[in-house]
């Protein structure tokens, strides 16, 4: 398994995803600067930069980034490569697992670097006091809450093999997430996990407005449930995807 991971890692060093890892954190900071500049000074006890970082950004930009990460690493495998891999008796399931591990690691790196840059900008340029524990919890939720979309993207792309369709699909499915996130059906819609989990952590409604202290959306139990669901969905869909890859490798001619 280690050899599969090393192979995928070597491919990524020369790929578009390497450039994304550099560009996305910069976009993250510029996006926050633009949004905060438009909104002005944060209300007492609230933070516009937290709202833009952990609500608007996951809603507007992150789904596209996740789609690009997946299609870039999966789209490298052309038909001639698959024939060669089959002739060498390589495991398609292990290759898929290696790709998942690499993308999850890249996603974690992007989110952590973006958060550090945002914290630095907010602290030294905006003079905001952001709770470090709150920031760490929000970062964890954003990362884990993105895992279901990552693994579903791998599954969908493996079935349709169309980059544009996957990107468009993730973009479209993100739009109802803010509405679904405030209903009991949010647990059935992985694209809403981030918005729902982060609401009590950063005090922001899924629609982007600030929450009152007594709001039912401030219940942290929902965050813990979302973390569990995200990991569970990721594990189940990943297992399903690996089984499909394993079956296809046996049937491949």
Where are these regions (language model features)?
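Aromatic- and glycine-rich beta-strand/loop motifs that create alpha-glucan
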Residues: 1-25, 250-252
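Secretory targeting signals
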Residues: 25-72, 98-161, 170, 175-178, ...
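Terminal transmembrane helical anchor/hairpin motif
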Residues: 39-49, 167, 172-253
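Transmembrane helix boundary and interhelical loop/hinge segments in multi-pass membrane proteins
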Residues: 50, 67-88, 92
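Amphipathic cytosolic juxtamembrane alpha-helices at the membrane-cytosol interface
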Residues: 89-101
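Membrane-interface helix-boundary motifs at transmembrane edges
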Residues: 93-94, 156-163, 247-249
């Amino acid at each position: 398994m280690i050899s599969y991971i090393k192979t995928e890692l070597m491919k990524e060093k020369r790929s578009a995803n390497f450039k994304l890892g550099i560009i996305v954190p910069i976009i993250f900071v510029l996006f926050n600067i633009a949004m905060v500049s438009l909104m002005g000074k944060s209300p007492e006890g609230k933070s516009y930069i937290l709202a833009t970082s952990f609500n608007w950004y996951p809603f507007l930009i992150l789904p596209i980034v996740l789609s690009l990460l997946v299609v870039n690493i999966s789209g490298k495998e052309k038909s001639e490569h698959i024939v060669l891999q089959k002739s060498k008796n390589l495991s398609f399931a292990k290759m898929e697992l290696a790709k998942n591990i690499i993308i999850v690691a890249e996603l974690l790196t992007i989110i952590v670097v973006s958060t550090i840059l945002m914290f630095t900008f907010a602290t030294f340029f905006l003079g905001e006091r952001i709770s470090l524990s709150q920031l760490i919890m929000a970062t964890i939720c954003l990362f884990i809450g993105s895992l279901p979309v990552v693994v579903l993207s791998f599954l969908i792309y493996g079935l349709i093999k169309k980059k544009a369709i996957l990107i468009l699909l993730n973009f479209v499915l993100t739009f109802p997430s803010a509405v679904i996130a405030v209903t009991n059906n949010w647990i059935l819609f992985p694209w809403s996990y981030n918005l729902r989990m982060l609401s009590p952590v950063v005090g922001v409604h899924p629609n982007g407005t600030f929450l009152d202290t007594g709001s039912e959306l401030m219940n942290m139990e929902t965050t813990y449930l979302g973390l569990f669901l995200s990991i569970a969905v990721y594990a189940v869909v990943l297992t399903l995807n690996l089984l499909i890859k394993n079956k296809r490798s046996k049937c491949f001619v």
